Amino acid sequence: GQVFGEMTPVECRVSHPIIGRIPSAQHKKASELREDEKTIFYQRLAWVSHVKGLVQGVNGQSVNLTIGGVRSYSEDKLYRGQTAMKFKIFVGWKVKVCSNLCLTCDGFSGTIECLTEADITQKASELFNSFNPHKEETLGLLENLRNTEISEELFCKIIGRLRLYQFLPVSEQRNLPSLNIGDQAVNAMVKGYVSNPNFGKKEGEEITCWNLLQYANEAVKSAYIDRWLERNQNCTDFVLGIQKALNGNDTEGYNWYLS
């Protein structure tokens, strides 16, 4: 709030609960545990809050500036002495109509390691204070995606290449940009193309790179929440790369997906 002004209430999502025990009881049988020795925690937690004063319209949709973070116990050694806690924090633009996050690389911290709450506060403040929303530049970049059309034939080529990429030798994969998703997510992109009420194909119209971004963002929503941020940023980078290739400005190998 000190950086961005008034925020909406924090929204949280947790993964499945883990029934555990306190460290001093780790060698007991489950049947021998007293109630005060049992613990319950959620392996992963994600939270977001929206900046009330930064809402824009992009391609007919409301877009909010959003901050948030992820904490995953799966990255920590819970039964050892105190070690650094691992967090991920981000700032990004969220498409309000379907909760898709259009995350750009200037607002993602990656993994940060902290020993105290003061460390967390300091590192989060460093990211938030250094973040420039680039409202015109970033949103202009996203809005411009609508100006690059993708025919059904071309969409099918991209989908086919996404499937093919997964089976290429590692040596070939290293030379190509990637969208880090599996078959299930690729299928979800196709489903979005066919039936998404907001971004799906409409009779007599071509889709655009903006639609492609929404299919990809929607597809990675089912990823574990501690992996979702990297995948979401990857979606944005991938579609921007596809657009450059379509406009003849490819420098990173995205033309492979169009051939």
Regions found by a protein language model. Give the residues of each.
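Charge-rich, low-complexity N-terminal segments
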Residues: G1-Q2
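Intrinsically disordered, low-complexity regions enriched in serine/threonine
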Residues: G5-S259
